[in-house]
Each structure stands twice: as structure tokens, then as C-alpha cells.
Amino acid sequence: EYKAHCMAESGESLTRDSLSAMYYDLNKLYYGGACKVDKEVAYEWMRIPHFYNSFYVYKYATSFCAAVALSRGILSGDKEKIAAYRRFLTLGGSMPPIEELKTAGVDMSTPQPVCDALDYFAELIMQYQNLLNDEG
């Protein structure tokens, strides 16, 4: 997706052939010889809906980070965070999303929400490992 945007920004035409060649080359690179990459994989990009919505995967990941920040604020029981979340809900899309999130105390223009989500993920991994150790 990033490479396709770079191609477009540099003035290169996005054709079936150019996108297929790029996708094929990326598959060869990513699989690194571990799998046979047949010629038909070059056309796989056409069936992936993510490519039809700009930076869908990045939006999904960043929205997950925002959701973690919002939910942890609510679950903490902090009345100010809960009130900020309620105010956020009342905005109803009247502002750009990044500005709306700031009203809820989540500043996506900083790395903090991503760092916090990764920390939370690490906590979940530790919980999972502890559960496995308890079972074993």
C-alpha cells in the first residue's frame, strides 16, 4: 500500500501491470525463498479490499490504539476520563477524528497511544504465559 502511494506521488501511473509487478516482487521478498511464489500471485492484490481504501491497515492499527486508550480510561473508573469520553461521543463526527480524540484525552499526534497499546499487549502476553504455566 505504501509503495503504491509512493508510485502515485512520484507521478508513476498505477496500472494493473505496475501494481502486479510490485506485488509479485514484494511477495518474493517477504517469503524469502521459503515458499514458491508462482506467477499468479502477482494478481492477488486485486482481491484484497485494503488496497481500495487509503492506508486502511494503518487506520485499523491506530484506531485500535485509540480504543485501548479510551477503554482503559473508562475501566480505570476515573470520573474525568469517563466525562471526557462522554463529551467525545457527543461530538458525533463534527470535528476531524484526531481533534475529537484529543477531547477524550487521546492525542494521536504523539507516539503515546501506540506505546501504551504495545505495553497493554505485553501485559496480555504475560497474563497468557502465566495461564499456560498454571495449566502446565
Where are these regions (language model features)?
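C-terminal, non-catalytic "cap/extension" segments appended to globular domains
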Residues: 5-136
